[in-house]
Amino acid sequence: MALTLIKEDGTGKVDANAYANAADGAAYHDGHLFASAWTAATLANKETALAMATRLIDAEYQFDGVKANEAQALQWPRAGCHDPDADGWNGGTVADNTVPKAVMEATCEMARELLIVDRTAAPVGEGLKYYNDGSVQTGYDKGDRRPVISHVAQALLMKFGSLVKSKSGAVRLTRT
């Protein structure tokens, strides 16, 4: 069955599966120096990458505020999400009927990354610190892990929430 890409438009769709569509991706990658993976992909692969990027962003990030509509499929739109760029020193919130441009751009960036490599799979040698062949000695580094969400996408998303760290022992608190 072919994927039908349904972009979240800020209304809290119950069937949305992406924060961006292929036209958004084309506009984002128009000024991107390393856009070849995106431009070479078929429309079907672009849409699949956008849907997967959206799923990964929703799974890996805990955004501030709450879903604007309890029945909506995705994390955005949100109510009460702080926007540090909104009202200068006073702060402000993202409108609860919109998906921020940075979230759309992070989705496009992640889609391009996914067209290059499956970021959910461990790369060859991940975690290997050293390996000696003579009398076989191997050492591992638990910190040597490629993040699922690229550093560029993380930078775009971080002002709206935080990356969920597994087994971190910390709880995110929000004042109301």
Question: What do these predicted regions represent?
Answer:
Residues 1-176:
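Divalent metal-cofactor coordination and adjacent catalytic microenvironments
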